Curated annotation (Swiss-Prot):
HAMAP family in the cross-refs: Cas1
Record protein name field: CRISPR-associated protein Cas1 2
Species: Methanobrevibacter ruminantium (strain ATCC 35063 / DSM 1093 / JCM 13430 / OCM 146 / M1)
Keywords of the record: Antiviral defense, DNA-binding, Endonuclease, Hydrolase, Magnesium, Manganese, Metal-binding, Nuclease
Gene that specifies this protein: cas1-2
Signal peptide: none
PANTHER family associated with the record: CRISPR-ASSOCIATED ENDONUCLEASE CAS1 1
Needed co-factor(s): Mg(2+); Mn(2+)
Keyword Lipid metabolism: no
GO biological process, any: defense response to virus
Family classification: Belongs to the CRISPR-associated endonuclease Cas1 family.
Superkingdom of origin: Archaea
Pfam families listed in its UniProt record: Cas_Cas1 (PF01867)
GO MF, one example: DNA binding
Amino acid sequence: MKLVVDGFGKSVAKRDNQIVIKENGKEINYYLAKDISQILLTGKGSITFDALTLLAENDVDCVSINWKGHVDYRLSAPDRKNAIVKKEQYFALTDSRSGYLAKAFVRAKIENQKAVLGTLAKSREEKDYIIEQREKVSEHIGKIEKLSNINSDNIRNNILGIEGQASHEYWSAFASVLDEKWEFFGRSGRGAKDPVNSLLNYGYAVIESEIWKSIYLAGLDPYCGFLHSERYGRASLVYDLIEEFRQQIVDKTVLSIVNRNQITPDDFEEDGNYIKIHERARRLLIAKILDKLNSKIMFHSKNISYSDIILYQGKLMADYLTNGVPYEGFSLRW
């Protein structure tokens, strides 16, 4: 179970083997620590040392996401000391395995972009432009496959160039299905200046915590990436693996709640150079993302949740690095 603690005046405490949630000092709920897989903190409040210790003892991640859609911190049990996996991960930076994985991440991302546009085209009468952009996006898959499996440092610029072209075409089609009132003209990344980008950023932050957990449990180093180059303090491997899941989990969810008017432009306000999501809209988005993570699809002939697929991909990456088990990025046809 993923537990969300939001709003103001909330506190998280411990009672025996339970996590207790309070509001303005009054107990409002409690849960057995062993039943919690992760806690998302999205409001203003506090957490006791005893609660943190109990969470760590039960291997429960505690993740704080601020209103800008940035992960402020992630608290977890001590790192799993899997030296063999990490050693192979570092060695892979100097050989063809790094290029193989970098290509796999981007190929899966582009395949999912193609899939999302296919879904959009099926549900709309005016779909010619979406189909046109989908075909352009699809062409980039072949370009990725043609790149040599060599050290990622030697092909990174080529991979990112192809990824950038595909993303430009994808976001152009994405924008075409949104009402003009949203003023969405393309993906802007961090520092969102419009409501849709702020929703995307927040949604990505929610699944980023899932990616961290997958990498941690697989014994991998989150700061040693293959597609995204190393930079001090940057969790490059987290940004690598999340590329496979943005479209199916977050992009589709944001499109759904916006186009169904479950969220309106009135649910946002300017705060300095940022667009701030009001609490009601933020709660709705988090609930929809968590519902998506818990929903199940057919994957390798099994009915499995998106959360478990994310865990599987981390383990598969570790198996590829240590045992040569082929790594295939996660993607769907639709």
